């Protein structure tokens, strides 16, 4: 469409709910320069096209379902959901009154406008079941949702200048039955599709055309009127009410016959005539001129003049269109011609314009079809001035405007085009100036120059459509891929969460080993992710490995934080495995805080998968880019814990003495030393002893010892699998070092004691021996196994003792589930041991408090006594049974 002026002009924007406006409820009416608009909410707006301002907004007590304007009386009728019918006088002085700032709705337009609350007295017909209405000169027609049937009611309209409340009811008839929607008991549920009412008058009727809008009312030519509604309606010159129901029925009621039926009752079913059944919800009923000569004459009519239409149309929600027209049959007889067309759907709204054109909107486009083109030529036996037929098929022409939920067609403009007033799903009010004569295909000849220009336009349009289709296809592919990924993620989550205590379909195992990097030994952790399920881990999956040291776990107020490693999982199919190696220490201070907890978790990123599919980054389509942020998931993703492994001192011990002499590796390096200390040591005289704290402690102080005793019977029951024929002490040491790299050598040599090196270089001695506990059981001594840890480093002995106690706790918990019973014990002896331990613990607290207040000279004796008490606590006289 050529022209300097823009075809679409946006007038104003109105607030709308998330997801856009729903079709069926919004309404746009235009009278002269004023636009009356309802978005389906509680507000009805009045917009001045000449001034470009929102002049007023009326607030109703509930959603507004339908609007009609009685132009000569300046009355606006509004159907309020579950309330009834309201009538507002547009000339009322209340429209110009000043309102407070609280009554202004700044979101509903470019400038604040007064919001006028509708007075409850404006409700002229209260009825919670009222679903549709239409107006005639002296009659108000309503459609009520009954318990099981629709009910049409007629009321007298007051004369101009009187109270707008309708008079008494003058007629009533029941229409077809329906299945009521589910709702709250005692409160009728709103139908998903509202019925459509409109009035039809014959051309000879004196009823003025004072209703605006496509479904308000129209006049039909006598030929079509008589064929559709019969001789009674034609003789009575009676208006007829057309009703389109949500079940697809298109029926009619002759008003004068309905009024007179009260005085002469008869069969009520005879008052209702079913014209057609679309088999889908009826959303629009209208009429238009299709004959070429009549259509041209109709376009030159003044807005207030009646146009005698020769074609009746009705639209269904899913795209089915019905057109009815008076036509000649083969015998030369005038008969009604009914044609059904299948157009793209779903249809959101429709309107009839000039030139025999019908406009209808879908979520993706606004289309126009021409019912005046393709009319069958007149035969020799038909009258020369007779009507032509309907086209056998319709080809919708795209106007490249999408998501229009309400439409109003204005008369032909001064420039010769057609003007549409439209409301989009995003709440934008716009005008569309169309010159459809250059857009619609026709039989008129064109020059070579115009044909070439037309071909260029068509090729350009094909290119744009092809490009848009490619973007849409890519967006659909991305969303399908995201849905497939989400389905796989759901399957993986269900498989992991439902595995319980059995083998997990996706597992992650952790092992440790020492490696030498440059001049320093580093403890490395190897995490193996294995997929034993039938699902694949593709886009969006990440393996998260968190390393938490003991200092961070115990000191909640410390500044240290856990280290988390994230490894993207790419194409890990069924049966595949992925190996990740990462350092555990020593840290920057040269030490290794044990125990270290390694937690493995699978993380699925919802924002990476879903966010990329909802808003493609390379799309040039504005409708794809405008992805509301609230559609994206609130959570970042889904976490699925896989494993939790604790690395303790027993796993980190190294045993250089176990290697054969000819293959013995050099002694493990300790933590990185201070360069100054290294320099002083090199300057030391040959033959002198080192003077470091560790050397002095090892030379002059006896090693610290900690022990724990376990029942031999308990150990045999726990170690019976895999250790048969092995001495109990050797089996116990092998069990303690099961996760150490040297366990195979310990097993091969059948050792019961071993000396290793801690990560800081201090020696740690493990001794396992059998002992007899004689004082616990009155029946005799209890055979036990004593596990003793010796080291000159207090920190290392505490870590090793903690590791041994942790293994014992796990073993006792597992054996307790098997229901083993303990022997009879001397309770008094146990109480005495417990009392002695309580005394030692109180003494420890006293000595620690004293160290905080004493000077340096007297604190040495206190510290020495504190060490003695700790040694006694590490040698309990109790036994694990």
Curated annotation (Swiss-Prot):
Subcellular location per the Swiss-Prot or TrEMBL entry: Nucleus
A molecular function GO annotation: DNA binding
Signal sequence span is none
BP GO annotations? interstrand cross-link repair
Keywords, A to Z, come to: DNA damage, DNA repair, DNA-binding, Nucleus, Phosphoprotein
Region listing for Disordered, in residue ranges: 94-119
The PTM Phosphoserine maps to 667
Q: What is its main location?
A: nucleus
Listed GO cellular component terms?
Answer: chromatin; cytosol; Fanconi anaemia nuclear complex; nucleoplasm
Could you describe the subunit structure of this protein? Answer: Belongs to the multisubunit FA complex composed of FANCA, FANCB, FANCC, FANCE, FANCF, FANCG, FANCL/PHF9, FANCM, FAAP24 and FAAP100. Forms a subcomplex with FANCB and FANCL.
What the protein does?
Answer: Plays a role in Fanconi anemia-associated DNA damage response network. Regulates FANCD2 monoubiquitination and the stability of the FA core complex. Induces chromosomal instability as well as hypersensitivity to DNA cross-linking agents, when repressed.
Protein name as catalogued: Fanconi anemia core complex-associated protein 100
């Amino acid at each position: 469409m050529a022209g300097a002026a823009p075809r679409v002009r946006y007038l104003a924007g109105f607030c709308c709910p998330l997801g856009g406006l729903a079709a069926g409820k919004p309404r746009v009416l235009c009278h002269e320069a004023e636009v009356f608009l309802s978005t389906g909410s509680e507000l009805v707006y009045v917009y001045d096209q000449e001034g470009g301002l929102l002049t007023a907004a009326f607030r109703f007590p509930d959603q507004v379902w339908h609007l009609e304007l009685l132009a000569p009386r300046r009355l606006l009728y509004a159907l309020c959901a579950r309330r009834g019918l309201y009538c507002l006088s547009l000339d009322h002085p209340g429209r110009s009154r000043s309102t407070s700032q609280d009554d202004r709705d700044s979101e509903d337009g470019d400038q604040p406008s007064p919001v006028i609350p509708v007075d409850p007295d404006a409700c002229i017909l209260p009825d919670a079941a009222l679903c549709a209405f239409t107006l005639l000169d002296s009659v108000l027609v309503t459609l009520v949702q009954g318990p099981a049937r629709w009910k049409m009611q007629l009321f007298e309209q007051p004369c101009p200048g009187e109270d707008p409340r309708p008079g008494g009811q003058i007629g009533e008839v029941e229409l077809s039955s329906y299945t009521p929607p589910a709702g709250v008991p005692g409160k009728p549920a709103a139908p998903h599709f509202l019925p459509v009412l409109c009035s039809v008058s014959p051309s000879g009727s004196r009823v003025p055309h004072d209703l605006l809008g496509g479904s308000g009312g129209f006049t039909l030519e006598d030929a079509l009127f008589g064929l559709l509604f019969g001789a009674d309606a034609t003789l009575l010159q009676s208006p007829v009410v057309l009703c389109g129901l949500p079940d697809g029925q298109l029926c009619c009621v002759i008003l004068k016959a309905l009024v007179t039926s009260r005085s002469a009752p008869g069969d009520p079913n005879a008052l209702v005539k079913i014209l057609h059944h679309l088999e889908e919800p009826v959303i629009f009923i209208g009429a238009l001129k299709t004959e070429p000569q009549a259509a041209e004459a109709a376009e030159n009519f003044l807005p207030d003049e009646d146009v005698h239409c020769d074609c009746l149309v009705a639209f269904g929600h899913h795209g089915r269109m019905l057109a009815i027209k008076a036509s000649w049959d083969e015998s030369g007889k005038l008969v009604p011609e009914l044609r059904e067309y299948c157009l793209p759907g779903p249809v959101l709204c429709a309107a009839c314009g000039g030139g025999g054109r019908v406009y209808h909107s879908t979520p993706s486009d606004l289309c126009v079809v021409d019912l005046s083109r393709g009319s069958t030529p007149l035969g020799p036996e038909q009258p020369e001035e007779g009507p032509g037929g309907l086209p056998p098929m319709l080809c919708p022409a795209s106007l490249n405007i999408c998501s229009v939920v309400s439409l109003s067609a204005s008369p032909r403009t001064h420039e010769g085009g057609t003007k549409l007033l439209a409301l989009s799903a995003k709440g934008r009010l716009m005008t569309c100036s169309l010159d459809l004569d250059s857009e619609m295909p026709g039989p008129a000849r064109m020059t070579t120059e115009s044909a070439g220009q037309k071909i260029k336009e068509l090729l350009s349009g094909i290119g744009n459509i092809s490009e848009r289709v490619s973007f849409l296809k890519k967006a659909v592919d991305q969303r399908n891929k995201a849905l497939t990924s989400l389905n796989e993620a759901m399957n993986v989550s269900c498989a992991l969460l439902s595995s319980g205590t059995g083998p997990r379909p996706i597992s992650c195992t952790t092992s440790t080993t020492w490696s030498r990097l440059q001049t320093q030994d580093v403890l490395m952790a190897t995490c193996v992710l294995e997929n034993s399920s039938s699902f694949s881990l593709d886009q969006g999956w990440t393996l998260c490995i968190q390393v938490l040291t003991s200092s961070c776990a115990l000191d909640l107020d410390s500044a240290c934080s856990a280290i988390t490693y994230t490894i993207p999982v790419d194409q890990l199919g069924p049966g595949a495995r992925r190996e990740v190696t990462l350092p555990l220490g020593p840290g920057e201070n040269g030490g290794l805080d044990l125990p270290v907890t390694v937690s493995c978790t699978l993380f699925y990123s919802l924002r990476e998968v879903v966010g990329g599919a909802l808003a493609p980054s390379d799309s040039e389509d504005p409708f794809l880019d405008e992805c509301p942020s609230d559609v994206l998931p609130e959570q970042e993703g889904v976490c699925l814990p896989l494993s939790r492994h604790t690395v303790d001192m027993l796993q980190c011990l190294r045993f250089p003495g176990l290697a054969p002499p000819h293959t013995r590796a050099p002694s493990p390096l300790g933590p990185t030393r201070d360069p100054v200390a290294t320099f002083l040591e090199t300057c030391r005289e040959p033959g002198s002893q080192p003077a470091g704290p560790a050397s002095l402690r090892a030379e002059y102080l006896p090693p610290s010892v900690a022990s724990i005793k376990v029942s031999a019977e308990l150990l045999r029951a726990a170690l019976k699998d895999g250790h048969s024929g092995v001495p109990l002490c050797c089996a116990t040491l092998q069990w303690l070092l099961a996760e150490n790299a040297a366990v195979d050598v310990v097993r091969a040599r059948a050792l019961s004691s071993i000396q290793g090196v801690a990560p800081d270089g201090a020696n740690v001695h493990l001794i396992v021996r059998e002992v007899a506990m004689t004082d616990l059981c009155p029946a005799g001594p209890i055979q036990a196994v004593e596990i003793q840890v010796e080291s000159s480093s207090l920190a290392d002995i505490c870590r090793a003792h903690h590791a041994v106690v942790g293994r014992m706790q796990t073993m006792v918990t597992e054996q307790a589930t098997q229901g083993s019973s303990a022997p009879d014990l001397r309770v008094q002896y146990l109480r005495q041991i417990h009392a002695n331990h309580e005394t030692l613990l109180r003494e420890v607290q006293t000595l620690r408090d004293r160290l905080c207040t004493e000077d340096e000279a007297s604190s040495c004796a206190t510290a020495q006594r504190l060490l003695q008490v700790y040694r006694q606590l590490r040698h309990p006289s109790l036994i694990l049974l």
